From Swiss-Prot:
Keywords: Plasmid, Tellurium resistance. InterPro entries: Stress/Tellurium_Resist (IPR051324), TerD (IPR003325). Not known; seems to contribute to the tellurium resistance (Ter) mechanism. Also involved in phage inhibition (Phi) and colicin resistance (PacB). Pfam families: TerD (PF02342). The lineage of its organism: Bacteria, Pseudomonadati, Pseudomonadota, Gammaproteobacteria, Enterobacterales. Belongs to the CAPAB/TerDEXZ family. The keyword Lipid metabolism does not apply. This is Tellurium resistance protein TerZ. Disulfide bonds: none annotated. GO terms for biological process: response to tellurium ion. PANTHER family: CAMP-BINDING PROTEIN 1-RELATED.
Amino acid sequence: MVSLVKNQTVSLSKESSALSQLHFGLGWDPVKKKGLLGGLFGGNDSIDLDAGCVLMDSTGKTIDTIWFRKLESTCGAVVHSGDNLTGEGDGDDEVINVNLSRLPANVEYLAFTVNSFRGQSFNDVENAFCRVVDQTGKELARYKLTEQGSHTGIVISSLRRNNGNWDFTALGHACRGRTIDDMHSDIVSAVIR
């Protein structure tokens, strides 16, 4: 498993032979409240973050968008696990599964995002991460999200088709937006360089 830093790229095809499916997991915890009242009343509030994925061609034109209101891509290759409203518990809070062999040939980029539909900022989030797991359950890459601040969205990472291989890049691009559509221009500028 490769632990990535911001703007680092890894070839997933080199990390896993016969790569056919990917599991993109996103996890987070609400910041624990400090002080007497925080301890008396549970210590934290729920944080509703939403994972999303934008399929794009080589120019950055959107082909499809997957998020909690559209859980499956038109081609059927990308499927969202559904909305986790709290961020509670260990492990992945939301998952996007990608069947690489079913992606249309014109899909060159997949941009993975997270945003707060409720408008909660990333000042209220800790221990956020994304990870990529192959079809055998092997974790190929992990990226710890450290982008705390008043923003409501992050373009987390991208997956790029590169001469038959798949390259995964940790982006960590903070932006504003309560929905994946609100973040569209930031997504394109972060992914297409």
